[in-house]
Amino acid sequence: MQFPNQAAAINPGLMASVFGLGCAAMLLEFTKMNGAGNDFILFDNRDRKISLTTAQIVHLCHRQRGIGADGIMGLVPCDSGKADWSWQFHNSDGSSAEMCGNGARCFARYIQKLTGATGDLTFETAAGVIRARFNGDRVTVGLTKPHGLRLNEAVALQQGPTEIHSLNTGVPHAIVYVDDADKAMVAGVGAEVRHHAHFKPRGTNVNFVQVKGPDFIRVRTYERGVEGETLACGTGVTAAALISARLRGFTPPVKVQVQGGDLLEVSFREENGEFTDVALTGPADFAFTGSVSV
């Protein structure tokens, strides 16, 4: 399987040594991709022969000792029959996640290249079925119906009571508006909100949102499961766009600049006070392929 910008395969013996995994039990062929800087390891598991442990996932995603990624995805058949395919998704800390917007675009592009699929395709996630369509080098994924909207909640933080809004766009997100995203305390405040009792038991992702203009925002995200800032978060920018529509009168499509510099686009409709037909559009780029002993 050949992809654009393919690099030399990683030496499996070397990688086994780096990971401390000893003798290779299996050679994992992978593809590295990114969606607006949010990067992922993808692999073909249609025969379901690959079963990675949490420790192996953490090693693979480690940026100094492994391949490096925000998450890892395996392509598997869809047992429910609700979609063409299904995914196995894990964050870089080994935890599973219901949904990932940037990951979904990369996953769709990966399926297209791997299978030769033409036209739209669907795959099942823990959040529901995702439909993807392609337009040149950009991918649009239709997201599941948002739920759990909460607005204007005063949450007690170390910096004092802070107004936070929240919405689940496949995974939970908290929204904090800031005057200047460059000055947002993403690491400190992000970690505090992520683990705050207000969002127990599983915590939340945290997005710092700066309004840049009409229907245009900038977003920085502290991601649960990565436990730090990422260059982009698709479900996060979607939550930020929808809450900006509700609170700031934004109309679709909403343009969102992420920390990596890319522009994403969120489209939607509002019916009877609810958001429907929510979709996220952005890049999904191949970086390289390789193989590693696991």
Task: Give the positions of each predicted feature.
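Intrinsically disordered, low-complexity regions enriched in polar/acidic and amide residues
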Residues: M1-N5, A55
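Intrinsically disordered, low-complexity segments enriched in serine/proline and basic residues
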Residues: P4-I10, L14-S17
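A glycine-rich beta-to-alpha transition motif near the start of alpha/beta enzyme domains, typified by
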Residues: V18-G136, I175-V294
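Short, solvent-exposed secondary-structure boundary/capping segments
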Residues: D137-T144
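Active-site-proximal beta-strand elements of phosphoester/diester hydrolases
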Residues: G142, E163-S166, R220, L280
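Active-site glycine-rich loop that binds ribose-phosphate moieties when present
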Residues: K145-I164, A191
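Internal active-site segments that recognize and position negatively charged phosphoryl groups
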Residues: A156-M185
